[in-house]
């Protein structure tokens, strides 16, 4: 008798995706981030669902409802801080996952890569709208500043912004619709994840060497299931340490002040995971130019596959490209730091240099390095 997991219409899909899936024998811990992102998404959906049971999306009561969750709901404080810091964990895993894709040339799987970029945009949109919901000072002013960027679009900009706001300023209508979108988007993300995996399983996983691994596959279960579970335990441990010892470490104290349209906070800034893009936005003195640079800072990922000049897929054996990659990482960390600083000398200049370097490395220096490496290897 054939095993039920190989014949049952539903279990068959699970079997081919998680159990009998042929996987490369040499994938490292950098390949754990996909499953970790799945874990983060599940944590966010579950904690978010329980928060939504007690939250009210009304300007008069939103702030109080969050306070009520933390003070009066059983383990409400735990659910709230798991959700807030779960978002940070999500983005750490996301950036590591994308970085892995760039380093090992996983972007050559075009469909998988492009769905991944759409996923990144969707997660960023969800996180932004979620940050508005507690209706603190930074929620309100963050929403005002970021939605206002759309007014830089020629001709239709102002109309578009007022349409998104549902009025002439960020108000009750805005909060209600942001809550609706924040609730629905994670389920759309979950559906996109399925498509992401569908495309990935068409080709199979890449591996650190970048060489086809068809001749050396091992079953996903038990080898990589146990490896994923170890990753889960480590991430849950780190998340719980953050939640239970310093839950407000990554938050902004201004968000503990209820939203007040008449009082602007001294430094309006987004959560840490958007600071690099915020720094790029601020480094350009022109509004439309800044918005375009902001969008391009993420959309540039879609261009990367077409700039791949190397005869090798992975950076594993390409020292010049490796150096540039780690300079890019350092540059992104610099931009993150600058995004959280006030707009004054020397931060403005550092931000501008770092922004130019970011685009230069990806668009010019990395393709050049690849060509030089090909030349050295006489290819």
Curated annotation (Swiss-Prot):
- Entry GO MF terms: metal ion binding; ubiquinol-cytochrome-c reductase activity
Other remarks in the entry: Heme 1 (or BL or b562) is low-potential and absorbs at about 562 nm, and heme 2 (or BH or b566) is high-potential and absorbs at about 566 nm.
Similarity remark: Belongs to the cytochrome b family.
Outcome, altering residue 153 to T: In strain: Isolate XJ03165
Spell out the GO cellular component terms annotated for this protein, sorted alphabetically and separated by semicolons.
Answer: mitochondrial inner membrane; respiratory chain complex III
Q: Which Gene3D superfamilies match?
A: Cytochrome Bc1 Complex, Chain C
Binding site residues for heme b b566:
97, 196
Q: How does it assemble?
A: The cytochrome bc1 complex contains 11 subunits: 3 respiratory subunits (MT-CYB, CYC1 and UQCRFS1), 2 core proteins (UQCRC1 and UQCRC2) and 6 low-molecular weight proteins (UQCRH/QCR6, UQCRB/QCR7, UQCRQ/QCR8, UQCR10/QCR9, UQCR11/QCR10 and a cleavage product of UQCRFS1). This cytochrome bc1 complex then forms a dimer.
Membrane topology, as annotated, equals: Multi-pass membrane protein
- Origin species: Lepus yarkandensis
What is written in the cofactor note of this entry? Binds 2 heme b groups non-covalently.
Q: Give each disulfide bond as a residue pair.
A: none
Q: What is this protein called?
A: Cytochrome b
GO terms for biological process? mitochondrial electron transport, ubiquinol to cytochrome c
Taken from the record, one Pfam family name reads: Cytochrom_B_C
Q: Superkingdom of the source?
A: Eukaryota
Binding residue positions for a ubiquinone: 201
Which cofactor is essential here? heme b
